[in-house]
Amino acid sequence: MILGPGGRIFINHGHPAYPHLMDFLTACCEPVCRTLYVSEYTISPSSLSAATAEGTYSMEMVRNVIRYFRLDEQQQIPVDVERYAALERRVRDSVQDTSLDLPMEVGEAKVSANGDVKAEEGCEEATDELSPLAGQVKKEETKEVAAEPRRRFLSLSKRISAKSEPLVTRAVVNTGALQPLPADLEQMLREEENSSRVRIVLQPCLRPVKRRAVGGDKQHSDEQQCQRAEETKLAYFLTSPDRNHMEHLVSRLQDFLVPVLLHGTRRWVVSDVDRGVEERSTAESGRAKTLRRLFEAPSSASGRSVASKSLTNEGANGDGLGGGVGRRCTRIVYKSQVMDGKMRNVRERLYKELSVRADLFYDYVQDHSLHVCDLELSENVRLRPYQVASLERFRSGNKAHQGVIVLPCGAGKTLTGIGAAATVKKRTIVMCINVMSVLQWQREFIRWTNLSEDQVTVCIADKKQMPGDVFITTYSMLIARRSNVPEMEQSADAKLTAKILASVGEQPWGLLLLDEVHTALAHNFQEVLNKVKYKCVIGLSATLLREDDKIGDLRHLVGPKLYEANWLDLTRAGFLARVECAEIQCPLPKAFLTEYLESQSDGDPFARRGTTRMAHSVVCLNPYKLWCTQALLEFHRNRSPPDKVIIFCDQIDGIQYYAQHLHVPFMDGKTSDMERENLLQYFQHSDNINAIILSRVGDVALDIPCASVVIQISGLGASRRQEAQRLGRILRPKPASLDNVCSYFYTLVSQDTHEISQSYERQSWLRDQGFSYRVLQSDMVLQHFLRTGGKLCCVGPPRWWYECAGPSCDSAVAAKGTYWIPFSQEAALRMQSRFVAGVRGCDLTATVLRDTPRPPELKNMGVEEKWTVCFSDSCAPETFGTVQLVEGNPLLVRRICCGPLAVEHDCLHGGEECLQYAVQQMKVMVAKNSKNRIPLTT
């Protein structure tokens, strides 16, 4: 690693030491830029706080990792990578197999059964091979310990304190490469190490100390029952080992704390004995123990453990060789109880006003309440390595750490959240962003756990169930403002909703899962953290990004970031699909460019940032975007097998505009939940449709594993989060086929507009994750489309045609194996308006049909003209329905279709009339929306 100013770290992925640093980078550093060959990280106070909260890395370990793996000016590191790899394997094997007693320090002595101290067999030779000096030191120290067998443990602990070197020093071959840390980084580590650590601990309530009354055994039995009830009750306590510091904090937090009546005196701070079960009596194993043995000096790790072990053994057996459990380490702490429901307020005030980061953890092993026996993963579940790593961070030390887990879209965040719930095995409540996400979580809980359908309940508009062992609902359902209507006047549905929400707020919950946690920063969503009585909260997100710079509030609202996966690493491992990203630049036709420039008037100070309605409409309804989308749809429709395409458009008018011209179904904010579910199911499982248009409702919590192509027409300004979320819709790996080797992400931008700069900003975060964008011109896409026989759709006035037997007039054209006669423009406009409105048909009178050419069959019939149009439900664009030319005559029924059928028609070349019509329609839509105050996006 290369250490830069301000805690910046640059990593070369090709260096052989990179695999050994991945765990350190994930746990202790914040990713800034992770590309294919080089990554940039930063060490900040927040990342160090998250590392200490997770519990694996101490500041001494962080310091040693940087010192021993830092490149010097000659591009050399102090350790030999091969020796370090061999040492790491030995340590890992000794951790997994307790019979392999790898010494914690150089030359550790081993005590035999008869009390003699002997050098450990099998380790001396390996030690001498790694360091000749170590072997000599070992022999001398063995003699020293053997000389005083009765004080072997005390001598051993003294020797360790004198030799404070971590195991990683055995792999050092280039001592000249060891460099001191920069002053700013050393100061940062020292502040984190020496700062007063304040914790918020969920633990049993304080037991009242009472004298035993003279009243007899019955009263004593009642007191014992009350005492057991008090022990099972949990509460949050603000704890600190420094009494003065604690009293200072309490003086600023009395609004959220509960005083204790002790010996007739009300006290805000009480002392207690912290037995430290979670830190001292629980044996470390696995990853944490391996890392501590490698990078922590024996004086701070092994020495304490050996000394405490000697005290324990001597206390149990008297001769120092027993295996019983003796005295435990204790210490005095000072605590103050937090009011119910005010824990978040305490953390927020500590962080914002007092600059104190309070760690929060939940000892779910000691808590026997809210237990759900069936909440465990099914036998057929096999978690992926990164999911296991994230859950290890969550349950480090057999305690549930509150925080955020960041995994890419399509990487299995839902299953990871289910794994967290199965770890604590407590009643769980899940908060989702929308109804589709609620139903998805319900299906996944039933699929991956042993829970029955009755145990997993939901509360949405169309399906309301009382809370079960696992309860799933939306943020908006829980915090919605409801009118104060008398209970007698409420409907049955309103009463049921009130009953469910009251039950949610009254019942305690073991785990609160926040899906898409970056949305929980909104003011209303923060109310969820106060309304739900949870013991531990975990946030899940794919993009921990917000453009309002409030993402840092997650540190005190939810907790530190426990784990963040590398997108490129998951792609290389095959867990995510490989994605080809392209930016297609589309020029503006002259008429559209004129309107865009006119909207940049001096009278509107915001116009140059592209915030006017006209500017948004011009760049969204750009005809070149429409034609490029048509060309891309045709290209991916002809692949083997055909690709499923998602088209994203944020503007309301744009969604309907593209849906009408491309004949593709769309889904926006007005689409009902039932229609959304049916449309998505039809899109995933039907071969008749390969594309769908989505508004902003499809950005998050939308599971469409079949999709492999995204075409983005417009977006929410320069939102990096939206860009990443939309790309995440196609990250699910697909079965290999002839053409399906990767996924495709296209973003269409209008040249010479604000979209160029916004697009570059939107792509910045994905570029930092290793994705690259190819810049293409629309001419290249359209030339390929036209060369393969494609025909661009018309943006001019709607053209409707009816079928005829032959070329009975000059305007008849041959297409689709027959002849077609055009309707008049007035008739076409009426048919188009009815068709767009979803009406099943319309009548055309003689006045409307004035300029429409008649077929030969209607000549000299002498009847009043009234044509009846009936639109088709499912056959477009092959046929759009039928028209009955004469009422009651089934022989005069003709098919109708829409679109430019004339071969010579081309809006791209010489279609000025069509472009002018498109501009006029755009102006009408902008004026209508401005008058009705319709928002730009939905």
From Swiss-Prot:
- Under which EC number(s) is this enzyme classified? 5.6.2.4
Q: Name one GO molecular function term.
A: DNA binding
InterPro entries attached to this UniProt entry: ATP-dep_DNA_Helicase, ERCC3_RAD25_C, Helicase/UvrB_N, Helicase_ATP-bd, Helicase_C-like, P-loop_NTPase, XPB/Ssl2
Q: Which CDD domains match?
A: SF2_C_XPB
Q: Which SMART domains does the annotation name?
A: DEXDc (SM00487), HELICc (SM00490)
Isomerase: is it a keyword of this entry?
yes
Q: Which residues bind ATP?
A: L407, P408, C409, G410, A411, G412, K413, T414
**Motif DEVH box per record, residues:** 515-518
Assigned keywords, A-Z: ATP-binding, Helicase, Hydrolase, Isomerase, Nucleotide-binding
Q: One biological process GO term for this chain?
A: transcription initiation at RNA polymerase II promoter
Q: Which Pfam families match?
A: ERCC3_RAD25_C, ResIII, XPB_C
Limits of the Helicase C-terminal domain: 627-781
Catalysed reaction(s)? Couples ATP hydrolysis with the unwinding of duplex DNA by translocating in the 3'-5' direction; ATP + H2O = ADP + phosphate + H(+)
Q: Which SUPFAM superfamilies match?
A: P-loop containing nucleoside triphosphate hydrolases
Please state every residue range assigned to the domain named Helicase ATP-binding: 394-562
What cellular component terms from Gene Ontology apply here?
cytoplasm; nucleoplasm; nucleotide-excision repair factor 3 complex; nucleus; transcription factor TFIIH holo complex; transcription preinitiation complex
- General function of this protein: ATP-dependent 3'-5' DNA helicase/translocase; binds dsDNA rather than ssDNA, unzipping it in a translocase rather than classical helicase activity. Component of the general transcription factor IIH (TFIIH) core complex, involved in spliced leader RNA (SL RNA) gene transcription by RNA polymerase II. TFIIH has an essential role in transcription initiation. When the pre-initiation complex (PIC) has been established, TFIIH is required for promoter opening and promoter escape. The ATPase activity of XPB is required for promoter opening and promoter escape.
Subunit composition and interactions: Component of the 7-subunit TFIIH core complex composed of XPB, XPD, SSL1, TFB1, TFB2, TFB4 and TFB5.
Give the similarity note.
Belongs to the helicase family. RAD25/XPB subfamily.
What is the name of the protein in this document? Answer: TFIIH basal transcription factor complex helicase/translocase XPB subunit
Question: What gene is this protein translated from?
Answer: XPB
